[in-house]
Amino acid sequence: MELNSVLKNSFEVDDAIDHLRSLGLFPHHDRVKSWDTRKMIDTINGADRNSFILDVGCNDSPILPMLRRLGFKNLYGCDLFLNTITYPALMKIVHSFYKRNYKPIIETYENKIFAISIQDLEKTNFQNNMFDYITSLSVIEHGVNIQNYFKEMNRILKKGGMLLTSSDYWPNKLVNKIISKDIRKMSPNNVFSKEEIEKDVIKAAEHNGFTLTKSIDFTYEDKVVHWKGGRNYTFIFFALKKE
């Protein structure tokens, strides 16, 4: 499996789901997001269980519960919002596989299993050089200032730490800025094009002290993601290392 790559087809989603299940985990409640979830989990899974890990935009993300199940201890999350609702689709999936209770993020936050905070990922209150890994699962397309993002992630990552980012992608530019009335459930502000990834995103990362762990495989086949209003695209994932 190529680490830094574009989601090519639905078969890669199926493979990711099977792989997560083989680890005793569960698919992402948005099925297609299991692809980049798997990449993040696989990248971190070989690390020391005492590593400090932050999931930005954690509210609808399964990353922290998955890492907890794999034995990681120092797990942090931040988001602008923390919903007080449960996720019926996610609960149904988990119950069908494991026949036991699974607590969504807000409940684990209330029970202090994770260190979850409400704050802006562009300007957090975390200490300098605090984290070994930071995960960002489909976050940066939602109105995040890319320069501020990489600057802040560099500040709070340890030297040699890794920033794992996924986002919406299509090689040619698609129409952007379609936002729902409820900002917490907004559709993607931006589906990044190949030119934007190369000239804007990766250049900004390099400017802020990051390097790609490996060049990105931009090979694609299908529009695997289907959003309301006829917006069809795919995902991209890339891992960056702090120099």
Q: For the regions a protein language model found, what residue spans apply to each?
A:
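Class I SAM-dependent methyltransferase Rossmann-like catalytic core
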Residues: 2-47
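Class I SAM-dependent methyltransferase SAM/SAH-binding core
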Residues: 54, 61-123
